[in-house]
Amino acid sequence: MGTEGKAGRKLLFLFTSMILGSLVQGKGSVYTAQSDVQVPENESIKLTCTYSGFSSPRVEWKFVQGSTTALVCYNSQITAPYADRVTFSSSGITFSSVTRKDNGEYTCMVSEEGGQNYGEVSIHLTVLVPPSKPTISVPSSVTIGNRAVLTCSEHDGSPPSEYSWFKDGISMLTADAKKTRAFMNSSFTIDPKSGDLIFDPVTAFDSGEYYCQAQNGYGTAMRSEAAHMDAVELNVGGIVAAVLVTLILLGLLIFGVWFAYSRGYFERTKKGTAPGKKVIYSQPSTRSEGEFKQTSSFLV
């Protein structure tokens, strides 16, 4: 009770100081008692905004989520997209039911009608949503000595989930995980934010069954399906056999070309001509004028 009383007195002192300061300086002050608000999805919440030092205040509320900006309240009036579930009062705005799309930063902006006086305050709203069942991507087979990346993700949790990995039912995220017998000869890193499990390099001890878990501090932690990964040796014998087969085929091709050339096949092809029509012309015998007879003959 004593702690709550001290906090209340401190809050009252801060608020009083802001009011007195605004009166002395002739400037308006805008204040909120809740700069960071968390509320479960589908419940109601009021975002408060208190101001002083404005003779004729005009209040606006702005919503920012990433690169998206929207007006919730303009000139003390709720805008159309929010009209069915948000109400305005001089002390703030009230959501009748929030969804995960309402996550973001809300700014209360107060100004004079003439624009000579201005103040603002921001409130970060987090809509609490438990994580859904995560999905994983695990290669069924990886070569020892190579790099392997296993991924885990879910897209419903708010705030965003953090991820942990398990191999054969043993947690890999604990500080002493690499000191245990199961992971002593393994080289891996885990990014709890992205959900990536990276082996670099893969060792023979990394074969096993893997699954991940997602949790965000709200609701129940969710576990993925399990998937098996095999760490296999590089198939040197197969590579050597493939190279030998390639060399044999190349040798046979070279021998075939040499054999055809040695038998004169290419020379005959180059010098030979396709059989065609032959024309034989014989000189006509001397005859008297007027007696003409064709004596040319054509052989085909």
From Swiss-Prot:
Residues covered by the Ig-like V-type domain: 28-122, 134-230
Cytoplasmic side, ranges: 260-299
Extracellular side: 27-238
Localization: Cell junction, Tight junction; Cell membrane
GO function term, MF aspect, one: integrin binding
InterPro entries in UniProt: F11R, Ig-like_dom, Ig-like_dom_sf, Ig-like_fold, Ig_sub, Ig_sub2, Ig_V-set
Glycosylation sites: 42, 185
Keywords: Cell junction, Cell membrane, Disulfide bond, Glycoprotein, Immunoglobulin domain, Membrane, Phosphoprotein, Repeat, Signal, Tight junction, Transmembrane, Transmembrane helix
Gene Ontology cellular-component terms listed: bicellular tight junction; plasma membrane; protein-containing complex
Disulfide bridge map: 49-108, 152-212
Membrane topology reported for the UniProt record: Single-pass type I membrane protein
Free-text comment about domains: The Ig-like V-type 2 domain is necessary and sufficient for interaction with integrin alpha-L/beta-2.
Reported function: Seems to play a role in epithelial tight junction formation. Appears early in primordial forms of cell junctions and recruits PARD3. The association of the PARD6-PARD3 complex may prevent the interaction of PARD3 with JAM1, thereby preventing tight junction assembly. Plays a role in regulating monocyte transmigration involved in integrity of epithelial barrier. Ligand for integrin alpha-L/beta-2 involved in memory T-cell and neutrophil transmigration. Involved in platelet activation.
Oligomer and partners: Interacts with the ninth PDZ domain of MPDZ. Interacts with the first PDZ domain of PARD3. The association between PARD3 and PARD6B probably disrupts this interaction. Interacts with ITGAL (via I-domain). Interacts with CD151.
Family designation: Belongs to the immunoglobulin superfamily.
PANTHER family documented for this protein: JUNCTIONAL ADHESION MOLECULE A
The protein's name: Junctional adhesion molecule A
Record organism: Mus musculus
Recorded name of the encoding gene: F11r
